[in-house]
């Protein structure tokens, strides 16, 4: 195959965002996987002679099945969780490498790949320090899901949602990079790109601060629970620690500022693709909307468990917005801890 048979012909920037131009004409190349497995194509030929979006689809499906097999073997559901900070960036780098190989990589494409690498490095480190990569570590929410879901449904949920859908979703989150690659330099990096870049950087710093505040609080709480002392580097009083959950710093105003930042980070990546293709709305927005849906569902489960564990959490829900701060300025204050002490 040639470049003409693996890449769409782009007559205008908007063509890069059209499903019927950029994706559907190449879905027949899914059959190239059979050629690879039968030895009729080596991997290099398969990689460079198959549409890059189709390559990503095939690799994500294969990886989802591999992770499902590992999960069944280890009886641990967090296999995808371990790769969550890595896969979107890996898929974006796939598009970057393809663009470099065919000399169509734009400044915008390189910036997107760099920003996603920053995102990946930070999230991987945060997941590592929380013990996510420890042998046998598993997200407590999956344990709860297994408990509440009918036994006959869970195997289907375990395969199709946790592994196939989630890996495919992580791939689709990187799809704006595909659009940016196709658009090339049809639209120069300009003011709107800078706005998307600034949105990313602001939310990146916000999420980093929120995660650090969360880490500091639970480190102090766990330390106090062990030996009834709080290291001097932590500035928490006993009322705050006795509450059991973090309601200080950014968490005074938002119950999940890190989740808010994460959703807006991926909105910024969507915007890069929309700007590159001059298409404010295109098919890649469904990946971002899917991420919003995932956060809605996982947050509901997390908060249900928090309400069962911490008596004050329902009060916290009433006073503080889930993601965005309340318009009326309502937030958590020290008097809320004092009031709870009196009630107890």
UniProtKB/Swiss-Prot annotation:
GO terms for biological process: steroid metabolic process. It comes from the Eukaryota. One of its GO terms (cellular component) is membrane. InterPro entries: UstE-like. Keywords: Endoplasmic reticulum, Membrane, Transmembrane, Transmembrane helix. It is found in: Endoplasmic reticulum membrane. One of its GO terms (molecular function) is steroid dehydrogenase activity. It holds the Pfam family DUF1295. PROSITE patterns: S5A_REDUCTASE. The keyword Transcription regulation does not apply. It is a multi-pass membrane protein. The chain crosses the membrane at residues 53-73, 84-104, 153-173, 189-209, 275-295. Belongs to the steroid 5-alpha reductase family. This is Uncharacterized protein C594.04c. The lineage of its organism: Eukaryota, Fungi, Dikarya, Ascomycota, Taphrinomycotina.
């Amino acid at each position: 195959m040639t470049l003409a048979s693996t890449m769409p012909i782009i007559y205008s920037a908007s063509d890069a965002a059209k499903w019927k131009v950029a994706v559907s004409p190449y879905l027949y190349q899914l059959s190239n996987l059979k050629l690879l497995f039968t030895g009729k194509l080596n991997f290099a030929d398969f990689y460079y002679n198959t549409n890059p979006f189709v390559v990503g689809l095939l690799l994500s499906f294969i990886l989802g099945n591999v992770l499902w097999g590992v999960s069944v073997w280890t009886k641990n559901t967090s296999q995808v969780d371990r790769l969550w900070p890595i896969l979107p960036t890996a898929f974006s780098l796939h598009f970057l490498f393809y663009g470099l190989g065919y000399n169509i990589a734009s400044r915008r494409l390189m910036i997107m790949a760099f920003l996603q690498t920053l995102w990946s490095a930070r999230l991987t480190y945060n997941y590592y320090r929380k013990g996510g990569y420890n042998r046998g570590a598993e997200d407590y929410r999956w344990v709860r899901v297994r408990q509440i879901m009918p036994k006959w449904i869970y195997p289907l949920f375990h395969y199709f949602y946790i592994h196939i859908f989630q890996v495919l979703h992580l791939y689709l989150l990187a799809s704006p990079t595909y659009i940016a690659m196709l658009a090339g330099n049809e639209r120069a990096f300009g003011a709107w790109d800078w706005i998307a870049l600034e949105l990313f950087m602001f939310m990146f710093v916000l999420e980093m601060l929120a995660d650090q505040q969360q880490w500091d609080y639970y480190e102090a709480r766990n330390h106090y629970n062990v030996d009834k002392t709080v290291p001097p580097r932590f500035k928490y009083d006993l009322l705050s620690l006795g509450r059991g959950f973090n309601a200080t710093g950014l968490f005074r105003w938002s119950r999940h500022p890190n989740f808010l930042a994460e959703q807006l980070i991926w909105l910024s990546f969507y915007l890069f693709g929309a700007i590159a293709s001059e298409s404010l709305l295109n098919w890649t927005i469904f990946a971002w909307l899917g991420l919003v849906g995932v956060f809605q569902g996982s947050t509901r489960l997390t908060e249900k468990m928090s309400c069962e564990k911490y008596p004050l959490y329902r009060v916290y829900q009433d006073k503080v917005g889930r993601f965005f701060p309340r318009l009326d300025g309502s937030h958590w204050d020290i008097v809320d801890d004092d009031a709870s002490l009196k009630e107890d």
